[in-house]
A protein has these predicted regions:
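N-terminal beta1-alpha1-beta2 submodule of the flavodoxin-like/Rossmannoid cofactor-binding fold
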Residues: 1-88, 145-155, 159-162, 168-179
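Short, glycine-/small-residue-rich phosphate/pyrophosphate-handling segment
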Residues: 93-139, 146-155
Length: 179
């Protein structure tokens, strides 16, 4: 599953995600979820241990691994992503994730904040990720044209994600942990 975190009108996240999805489709079945197109319930309705299923609950639960494309906003990731993570707490558990971040300096602070949150959910984040510096300068007619070396960096992260996804799928099937 590939999750597009930004919901702003003027965003490059979807263009970056489309490029990531095309690369990931060589190794994975990609289910792209754009949070700008999903109506999540208000946080005040969230109940400990779960709430009302959302339009993406089954898609998150059914995925073995995640690619998260997120901007860095104010030295972290956007509230839309935090809401999606918190609302679907159990669905994320014991799986793997790779973060593709972007921002003026590559979005690495968003990645580091996500690592801590995902650790709480027992999500293994790959060591490799991709941080894209000023991706808005790499748009050509709305299509993301990656800078030199970005494809190779993403490829390395996808190899790690594939390894962790397989390992954790096997572990969940053979030795499930209680939630």
């Amino acid at each position: 599953m590939l999750l597009v975190a930004s919901v702003r009108d003027a965003r490059v996240g979807r263009a970056v995600a489309d490029w990531v999805a095309a690369r990931a489709a060589m190794s994975f079945d990609v289910d792209l979820i754009d949070l700008a197109e999903v109506d999540l319930p208000e946080d005040r309705l969230l109940q400990p241990g779960g709430g009302v299923p959302t339009p993406i609950t089954d898609r998150i639960a059914g995925a073995d691994g995640y690619l998260v494309v997120t901007p860095e906003y104010n030295h972290s990731y956007p509230a839309s992503l935090k809401q999606a993570i918190d609302w679907h707490y159990g669905e994320w558990m014991f799986k793997a994730a790779t973060v593709v971040s972007y921002g003026a300096q590559g979005g690495w602070l968003a990645t580091e904040h996500l690592r801590g949150v995902f650790t709480e959910l027992h999500v293994v984040t790959t060591r490799r990720g991709l941080g894209l510096r000023a991706p808005w300068t790499h748009l050509q007619e709305g299509v993301f044209a990656p800078p030199e070396g970005a494809g190779e960096e993403l490829g390395g992260a996808l190899v790690e994600l594939e390894w962790w996804t397989r390992a954790l799928r096997h572990a969940r099937a053979e030795h499930p942990l209680p939630r």
